[in-house]
Curated annotation (Swiss-Prot):
N-terminal signal peptide: none
Pfam families referenced in this protein's UniProt entry, alphabetically: Actin
InterPro entries named among the record's database cross-references: Actin (IPR004000), Actin/actin-like_CS (IPR020902), Actin_CS (IPR004001), ATPase_NBD (IPR043129)
Subcellular location per the Swiss-Prot or TrEMBL entry: Cytoplasm, Cytoskeleton
Purpose: Actins are highly conserved proteins that are involved in various types of cell motility and are ubiquitously expressed in all eukaryotic cells.
Enzyme class per UniProt: hydrolase
PANTHER family: ACTIN (PTHR11937)
Name of the protein in its database record: Actin
EC code(s) of this entry: 3.6.4.-
Reaction catalysed by this enzyme: ATP + H2O = ADP + phosphate + H(+)
TM spans (from-to): none
Protein family according to the UniProt entry: Belongs to the actin family.
A GO CC term assigned to this protein in UniProt: cytoplasm
Length: 353
């Protein structure tokens, strides 16, 4: 979350809500009944943690409201009734969800105006394009989204329930095979950190395995114990391209290719040459080169393929939103409070597409 026109978000925190497992355990500590984001993360040992967003879709609106409240009042320290709000949504977000979102913004937070944009479209804008295909992969879900002249092509969007959380689980399993045990939620966070700091995508996994001893890295756990991580460094993200490792079907390159093949033959060339990676799970070093190699194998041989993996791709959805909402031409696009009062939540389908 942050402000239009800024080049990076002001607040970055996990979309989680925690409630104390046992009332009164923290007597005298001014215990709250709900913790959000980093506060919940750091106390997860004594909390029951909930994820209101599952596979990119909001499934618990009460918790989501708490997250927005925390964003406005604690993180950004703004009064929501004084600022128009641009929100982002997953591709294929159900219509009822968009309406509920609109209703909460206008009725609970009294915003003066709002707009809802598809995440992948904003990532494409952030890369300076209006046509291309975006592979957006976060913690809970991945999507391939072809976009033509600023419009997502719904018939060709594919969703893959393989993302950051699955890779963290897989790395936990690989490390357990090495004899290291990570079971509690706090230890899971350690694995996530190992993933972020040490994992990378190999261009050719067979070749990488021959270099093994040199690729070992050590990682110090919070208790001072040092563990060694070797082939796990590239075997973990390999699951993105080869989900058979997780007992799943096709990988991200095949999904991207299938998504392009669902599009009109005349625009495929533009999609192949404008393939944009976005989201935290696309941050592994080497992922751009590997994607280039995999797509080249799948595509017609004459096709020019360009994979774009910009350094700020973790926040490219947010950056695209910052760009869009600062444009003078965008100012007429907002849904105003008056329009909402007149037409109700369904106005979102007329104005945001």
């Amino acid at each position: 979350a942050g402000f239009a026109g800024d080049d990076a978000p002001r607040a970055v925190f996990p979309s989680i809500v925690g409630k104390p497992k046992h009332q009164g355990v923290m007597v005298g500590m001014g215990q709250k009944d709900t913790y959000v984001g980093e506060e919940a993360q750091s106390r997860r040992g004594i909390l029951t943690i909930r994820y209101p967003i599952e596979h990119g879709i909001v499934t618990n609106w009460d918790d989501m409201e708490k997250i927005w409240h925390h964003t406005f009042y604690n993180e950004l320290r703004v009064a929501p009734e004084e600022h128009p709000v641009l929100l982002t949504e997953a591709p294929m977000n159900p219509k009822s969800n968009r309406e509920k979102l609109t209703q909460i913004m206008f009725e609970t937070f009294n915003v003066p105006a709002m707009y809802v944009s598809i995440q992948a479209v904003l990532s494409l804008y952030a890369s300076g394009r209006t046509t291309g295909i975006v592979l957006d992969s976060g913690d809970g879900v991945s999507h391939t989204v072809p976009i033509y002249e600023g419009y997502a092509l719904p018939h060709a969007i594919l969703r893959l329930d393989l993302a950051g959380r699955d890779l963290t689980d897989y790395l936990t399993k690989l490390l357990m095979e090495r004899g290291y045990s990570f079971t509690t939620t706090a230890e899971r966070e350690i694995v996530r950190d190992i993933k972020k700091k040490l994992c990378y995508v190999a261009l050719d996994i067979e070749q990488e395995l021959t270099l093994l001893p040199r690729l070992e890295k050590s990682y110090e756990l919070p208790d001072g114990q040092v563990i060694t991580v070797g082939s796990e460094r590239f075997r973990c993200p390999e699951a993105l391209f080869n989900p058979g490792l997780l007992g799943m079907g096709s990988g991200i390159a095949r999904y991207l290719f299938n998504s392009i093949m669902k599009c009109d033959v005349d625009i495929r060339k533009d999609l192949y040459s404008n393939t944009v990676l976005s989201g935290g799970t696309m941050m592994f070093p080497g992922i751009g080169e590997r994607m280039q190699k995999e797509i080249t194998t799948l595509a017609p041989s004459s096709m020019k393929i360009k994979v774009v993996a910009s350094p700020e791709r973790k926040f490219s959805v947010w950056i695209g939103g910052s760009i869009l909402s600062s444009l003078s031409t965008f100012q007429q696009m907002w849904i105003s409070k008056e329009e909402y009062d007149e037409a109700g939540p369904a106005i979102v389908h007329r104005k945001c597409f």
